[in-house]
Amino acid sequence: MNIFTRLFKVSTTGTKIKILAFAIFANIAFANESLQKLFKEYNVSKDKQEYINKECNKEVFKDNFKDLSKIEQIYKFEVARIDCEVNNLGEVLGSTQGILASLNYGYDEYDKLLNKYYKLYRAEVKKQNKTTPTGAFSHEPNIQNIKKGQKGQDTLLEEQRAWLKLRDSYEAYIRKHHAHIYDINGGGTIYSIHTSNARLGFLKMRVNELFSRYLMMITDGGVEFDSIFGSNVDGDI
């Protein structure tokens, strides 16, 4: 049974089937293009390519998608597919360079999801007219200086720019941390893999954050304050 037959069994109406199948087909097409380049670069045999595809087809349907909304189904499928491909690529390629290539592939695929869900979340915020002028918060002292009809700061855009700076700073730290650990332990290629894993994990956290907010905006019309680095709002870990 191929992956699209399984998808058809998950959805119950013709409209849902068409939307879900099209969305997933588009994601597979983009991912396959990137995968083919990687397969070609590392001379991955056809049987190993088929093995990865088969394993990931099985992996994405381990969970029961039918109890989720269409939006959640698509997201769960996307991340499960990428994670499975990264894991199986690493096993097939085997070498340190191959594992690093698989992690870089995962980073690129999650970066596509970052752009996708940032745009969807942004569109939903605008649709619900949730933007707020700079200074229009009770804790900001310049609230009285906001003139009626004045266009304020795009807080979501500013937040995303701040996150991009945070990402760059985090990745710079990870590289220095890797160099230090490598030096202390007298070398070891495993540390470069740890570095790439940490880099990918940071990006995945942001993608999940944006998707969660997008889903909350659609279902509840609001979002919660997000913690970062495992810290709660009150500062506890």
How does the language model describe each region?
Residues M1-E33:
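Classical Sec-dependent N-terminal signal peptides that target proteins to the secretory pathway
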Residues N32-I237:
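N-terminal alpha-helical modules
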